UniProtKB/Swiss-Prot annotation:
Family listed: Belongs to the methyltransferase superfamily. RsmJ family.
InterPro entries (alphabetical): 16SrRNA_methylTrfase_J, SAM-dependent_MTases_sf
Task performed by this protein: Specifically methylates the guanosine in position 1516 of 16S rRNA.
One of the record's GO cellular component terms: cytoplasm
MF terms in GO: rRNA (guanine-N2-)-methyltransferase activity
Underlying gene: rsmJ
Residues the entry annotates as binding S-adenosyl-L-methionine: 101-102, 117-118, 153-154, 171
HAMAP family on file: 16SrRNA_methyltr_J
Native organism: Escherichia coli O157:H7
Name of protein: Ribosomal RNA small subunit methyltransferase J
EC number: 2.1.1.242
Cell compartments where the protein resides: Cytoplasm
Membrane-spanning parts: none
Annotated keywords: Cytoplasm, Methyltransferase, rRNA processing, S-adenosyl-L-methionine, Transferase
Length: 250
């Protein structure tokens, strides 16, 4: 995949070249999207809109730390949707990981989560965030046990993941109507990189065959159900719903 690669570390140690080779990235000086290695982290920038700033994965500080410490925990909609109850903490495959926010919430309340991400740039951002998270004294121990990244397309990987998870979680890219600055910034940069998930409808059936208990699909409240398969079961929040489908028991 072609993208502009920029090294701002000043170390001259070739780390960016190693990273590019690992993820199959090819430097393209004219690309509007840039993957930038800074002294702190790896980030994605839209070069023609510098005011949007860089997008990076941060499990340790910022919004994720606030959500972990002061969020709803087990009361969060995504936790309710996957079925967390009492001692039951399902094993989850997040088949559309993105920046890993929902996966992190599930891991922080005790679930084991395997994240699938097919876009190599997004996978590189996730991997960088995980590496910093794993090294953190406060969360590193449980994060290594509970949150993993698999760089693969869900369309193919969902058929051969072992062991089978109890829950498959899907949050396909869907055009957002929200006006919040964060969503607008991230969605603009993200959609410039990966575009909408035009093949997302093809994920529902393999997800239902893989999950032993249920499939959870996060949708904006104005979006039709995935693959136009309606379900009466959903956890509804302001602006979103988590549609719940039966999986395939062992």
């Amino acid at each position: 995949m072609k993208i502009c690669l920029i090294d701002e570390t000043g170390t001259g140690d070739g780390a960016l070249s190693v990273l590019a080779a690992r993820w199959g990235l090819e430097h393209d000086e004219d690309n509007l999207m840039a993957l930038v290695l800074t002294p702190e982290h790896l980030e994605l920038r839209k070069r023609d809109e510098p005011k949007l700033g860089g997008i990076f994965v941060d499990f340790v500080g910022g919004a994720m730390a606030h959500r972990r410490k002061f969020g709803g925990g087990r009361g969060e909609a995504v936790a309710k949707a996957v079925g967390i109850k009492g001692d039951y903490l399902p094993d989850v495959v997040d088949a559309t990981a993105g920046l890993g926010r929902d996966a992190f919430v599930l891991a922080s309340v005790g679930c084991r989560v395997r994240m699938l991400e097919r876009n190599p740039v997004v996978a590189a951002l996730l991997d960088d965030g995980l590496a910093r998270g794993y090294a953190d004294a406060e969360i590193g121990g449980w994060l290594q046990e509970r949150l993993q990244l698999i760089h693969a397309s869900s369309l193919t990987a969902l058929t051969d993941i072992t062991p089978r998870p109890q829950v498959v979680y899907l949050d396909p890219m869907f055009p957002h109507k929200q006006k919040s600055a964060l969503v607008k910034k991230e969605m603009r940069v993200f959609q410039s990189l990966v575009g909408p998930d035009l093949d997302a409808d093809g994920l529902l059936e393999p997800a239902r065959l893989l999950a032993t208990k249920r499939v959870v699909v996060k949708r904006p409240d104005y979006a039709p159900p995935l693959a136009n398969v309606a379900t009466p079961n959903a956890v509804v929040t302001k602006g979103h719903r988590f549609d719940i489908y039966a999986g395939t028991p062992v």
